[in-house]
Every structure is written in structure tokens, then in C-alpha cells.
A protein has these predicted regions:
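Short amphipathic alpha-helical interaction segments
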Residues: 65-80
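Short helix-capping/hinge SLiMs at alpha-helix to coil transitions
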Residues: 47-52
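A short, conserved structural fragment
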Residues: 79-91
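A short alpha-helical element within helix-turn-helix/winged-helix DNA-binding domains
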Residues: 53-65
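Helix-turn-helix/homeodomain-like alpha-helical modules used for DNA recognition
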Residues: 114-120
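General nucleic-acid-binding
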Residues: 1-12
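Short, cationic-aromatic polyanion-contact patches
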Residues: 34-35, 56, 89-114
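Short alpha-helical segments that sit at the start of domains
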Residues: 11-43
């Protein structure tokens, strides 16, 4: 039971973190629509993370149905904000490289503090 409660707190904390980081700290020239897309993308990426799916462009495209360009545009802004980190890994066929992403340690540090506060 405590595990489910903890997951709910963490999920809520992620939503609050995403809204604050993205809406309260706009990037120059960024549209409101772009910020809303980033918040939605954060939620999708977090669900993928919880399901132990690799955060690759191909996986995100498969799940969202977005175009490759749309996914890249949104994810690159999250990388620029320091929310995601990017590494190059092998693609699923093992022949080329694939861009892989993961949440930066600052995200989980922020969530850890929020869930600890929420559980008190």
C-alpha cells in the first residue's frame, strides 16, 4: 500500500515539477504551445521510464504518433532545459546509432524532496 501511495506522490510531484520548470522558466522565442507540448511529453516520458522502456526517438514516435521532427523539437527543448540528458546508443538493429534520453539527476532529486515533503 505504501508503494502505491509513494508512486502517486511521485507522479503528482512530476506534474508540479514539469509545470514549474517549463511554464515559470520560458526559453526566449518559445511559444505557449511549445511549453504545453513539453509538459505533455514529460508525462509520456515518465510513464515510459516507469515501464522500463528506453527513451528513444523511435519509441516516443511509436507511442505518441507524432512526427520525428515534432518529437525532436520537443525533446531538444527538454534537453536544453536540463530536464533530460542525451546519449548515443546502438539502434535496435545494432548497426547505427540511436539518440537515447534519460531524466537528469536533478529531476529525481526534485521529486525525492517533493515526495518526502508530501509523505510527511
Amino acid at each position: 500500500m505504501a508503494s502505491n501511495l509513494s508512486e502517486r506522490w511521485q507522479s503528482q510531484a512530476l506534474s508540479v515539477f514539469a509545470v514549474r520548470e517549463i511554464l515559470e522558466k520560458p526559453i526566449d522565442g518559445e511559444s505557449a504551445q511549445s511549453r504545453i507540448k513539453q509538459i505533455g511529453m514529460m508525462n509520456i516520458l515518465y510513464l515510459m521510464h516507469q515501464a522500463h522502456q528506453k527513451l528513444t526517438l523511435s519509441n516516443v514516435i511509436d507511442i505518441t504518433g507524432m512526427t520525428r521532427g515534432g518529437v525532436i523539437e520537443t525533446i531538444e527543448l527538454l534537453v536544453r532545459r536540463g530536464i533530460l540528458t542525451e546519449t548515443l546508443g546502438r539502434n535496435s538493429m545494432g548497426r547505427g546509432t540511436a539518440r537515447q534520453f534519460e531524466f537528469s539527476p536533478q529531476v529525481f532529486a526534485a521529486l525525492g524532496g517533493a515526495t518526502a515533503t508530501g509523505n510527511a
